[in-house]
Amino acid sequence: ALIDAIYVQERNDNTDEQCKEAKEAWDALTDAQKELVEGENADPDYFGRDTGDASKDDPLNGDEIGENELLVVSFGTSFNDSRAEDIGGVEKALQAAYPDWSVRRAFTAQIIINHVQARDDEKIDNVDQALERAVSNGVKKLIIQPTHLMHGAEYDELKEAVDSYKDKFESVTIAEPLLGEVGSDATVINEDKQAVAEAITAQAVKSANYDSLDAAAEDGTAFVFMGHGTSHTAKVTYSQMQTQMDTLGYKNVFIGTVEGEPEETACENVIEAVKAAGYKKVILRPLMVVAGDHANNDMAGEDEDSWKSQFEASGAFDEIDTQIEGLGRIDAVEQLYVQHTKAAMDGNGVQDDAE
């Protein structure tokens, strides 16, 4: 019940105390009792799963910001190692590129913020908290760099949240998400999508110990990059990424989504596409900034509905491997965020100048 109480998307006056109580109650249990924990959203993994050392992650929630702030906004993840490497990787790259700006962090998922706070006593600002912190610190110029993949629902909600604060600063600019403008249909691609396609493919090939993508193809290996998927109109972005892969000549690279939107990206349809192309080995990798819950469970988990299990159950392939690595730890992707932030600094972004 304590876990269920904090498994919510809204922060309230009781959140901090509820997180503390949940942690104390968990710590008071024996190992045998911990295995029996249950609730609508509670299970032993909520506190007990080893996701890495939280102390290696910097929540970037300090004061003494100065007049120029670069706020990096992410959905978030409760997987400690992924948070430090993927989200932290982007944040560190931005701080290195812009030493005269103070980099701070905000997550949009309060459920994740509460999870991390209750389990690890690490406090991460939500967007409102981060904006209030900026105001109280006298920030004048605020640039917000979302780590979101696209102009989807999360990006729209961020713009709405920031809009109510625009009069608190001399200027507020929201930079582009990773894949840039959406475009009108599945055939529309851009430099951002090309850069990400090249970066994730090169890293996947390297992690699989192949000399090249062609060498992987000759070995009968296909790469499947699994995104989240969305019912938002921005879902065409995933189709565009497949178009981008095809345009680059990456014939053994396929795009899928957990949600199966767009339809051709659903797991069963991707399985059929890979099978029809004749590949016998498959490497699954997340097309996500963070290798969090979706990568570890929906993609690489042992449950029968995970992508790994579905590919194995198809009986069409000899070998299924997974790479649990987010986009945020890839140097070329980090530098793309640096470029988007630079464009925002130069006035190319969603601009909200105070009246």
Locations of the language-model features?
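Beta-rich interaction/scaffold domains
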Residues: 1-50
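Extended amphipathic ligand-handling, pore-lining, and cofactor/metal-binding catalytic surfaces
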Residues: 45-283, 288-355
